[in-house]
Amino acid sequence: MNAKDFGIPQNRERVFIISIRKDIDNGIFEFPKPFELKLRLKDMLEDEVDEKYFLTYDHLKRIDNWKSFQNPLNCVLGGNDISQTITTRIAISDGGGINASTKLYCNEIESKINLRNGKYENKKIRYYTPLDCWKLMGFEKDDYIKAQESLTDFSLTNNQLIGCLYKQAGNSIVVDVLKHLFIELLKINILKGIKL
């Protein structure tokens, strides 16, 4: 199942295996049917972000080969595109900032993205923020805020906190995909009478 087939503009394919006990299986379970994606990447990303998420001229100079952006895996995504797969790989430099990467934010569906990726907007290139990543996993801003607040008890530096939020997003299952799976299970009363 792919997140982009269930309302989230991210190309994130995952295999789901559904097991149903024999004594309650009525044999009519069907995986949810994909539907047309209406949201685009620009609909999910924050409009106003801290300047630290934008690549500076020095960062851009460090990128060895600008032609690498022609390679789909090293592409700068545009606002009408679908995000590549959010993963847990992040880059925090020794100086405490976010490291430059040749994988940034061009056009069309990409096959894979890591959390170092960014967005091209107003001729500026930026990385996804932790909130961007959470939203691309189907979470609401309130969910992100609760997770952020729960991490404040651990005496983390700001960079450690940001790293944890990126990793939590990258390790998550897209909420909308699970929601549609559960709807199909509920349609056939699989969960009726079962204590969860």
State what each model feature region is.
Residues 21, 90-92, 132, 140, ...:
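A broadly conserved detector of short glycine/acidic/proline-rich loop/turn motifs that flank catalytic sites
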Residues 25, 143-146, 191-194:
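Cytochrome P450 catalytic domain signature, combining two hallmark sequence patches
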Residues 81, 131, 173-177:
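Generic recognition of stable, solvent-exposed alpha-helical segments in well-folded globular domains
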Residues 89, 139-141, 168-172:
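Short, loop-centered acidic/histidine patches that primarily coordinate divalent metals
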Residues 162-196:
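Generic C-terminus detector
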